[in-house]
Amino acid sequence: MLNFSDRLIESIKKKNSVLIAGIDTSIENVPDYFIKRFYDREKSEIDNLKTILFEYNRRIIDAVEENVVGVKFQAAFFEQYSYHGFEVLHKLCEYAKNKKLVVIFDGKRNDISSSAKGYSNAYLGETPVFGRKIRFFEFDAITTNPYLGQDGIKPFVEDCERFKKGLFVLVKTSNPSSADFQDLTVEDKYLFEVVAEKVYEWGKNCVGKEGYSDIGAVVGATQKEAAKRIREILPNSFLLVPGIGVQGGKVEDLKYFVDSNNMGIIVNSSRDIIYAYKNYVHSDFEKSSYLASKSIKESINAAIS
């Protein structure tokens, strides 16, 4: 089996795209006509919720698959519906994998080593059950929080090596208050630089045949100045770049995120794709999402070519 980074590069070349569709759907943003179409008064509200969430997101995936290399499922938008949401997440993960898309779990997980191992078992590896190992999810990669240090990251890295999976560590995020901690100085370096250096160390043993590490970084699209420095520290890592569009990141700034080969990034867009119907004159959300993903893909390609 190919390393995660090699599989990602294959998909990028095949699709001529570095775009990731973020699946961050809340039921209140699903069009009313779609809810009415699937709402069954003979079923419980929970059953209707699960059906509508799955069917809406499934159609989004179908609509954008031509223009994206993968999908990123934001855990919070499924956790808010308790275990019912995770039932939907499990089905959508399988659905996207069957579409040959790269599938990322955006859970920003971490904890002390034993707990981190549980998270890694769930989303990257295998979980021991009655003397055998069971794989519950088929994600290709996961986002993690580095705050607990190496022992909290180690289980994820080990599973990346063993199962050819990927890891994206939070380094410099797109939210306005990211500077509260990430821009603090440690021995004349910003804290985000120190974290990036750790990411480089953690990824040394997870390098694919194309020369890229399977351990990458999350760097917000609003952080172009930081991105320049992070790219110097991580010359052969993929950067997962959220925050273009609604969050204020500019497509034209992506040139500061790519490596010397104009590679090394995947760019997430969520609301501009999954709720694109709000910005188009017609009400066909599938067509709107297709057109939005195509437009974003082309804009990104123009910016980094």
Curated annotation (Swiss-Prot):
Active site: 108 (proton donor)
Top-level taxon in the UniProt lineage: Bacteria
Reactions catalysed according to its record: orotidine 5'-phosphate + H(+) = UMP + CO2
Keywords: Decarboxylase, Lyase, Pyrimidine biosynthesis
GO annotation terms (biological process): 'de novo' pyrimidine nucleobase biosynthetic process; 'de novo' UMP biosynthetic process
Biological pathway: Pyrimidine metabolism; UMP biosynthesis via de novo pathway; UMP from orotate: step 2/2
EC number in record: 4.1.1.23
UniProt keyword ATP-binding, yes or no: no
Gene Ontology MF terms: orotidine-5'-phosphate decarboxylase activity
Keyword Ligase applies: no
Family statement drawn from the similarity comment of this UniProt entry: Belongs to the OMP decarboxylase family. Type 2 subfamily.
Protein name: Orotidine 5'-phosphate decarboxylase
Taxonomic source organism: Caldicellulosiruptor saccharolyticus (strain ATCC 43494 / DSM 8903 / Tp8T 6331)
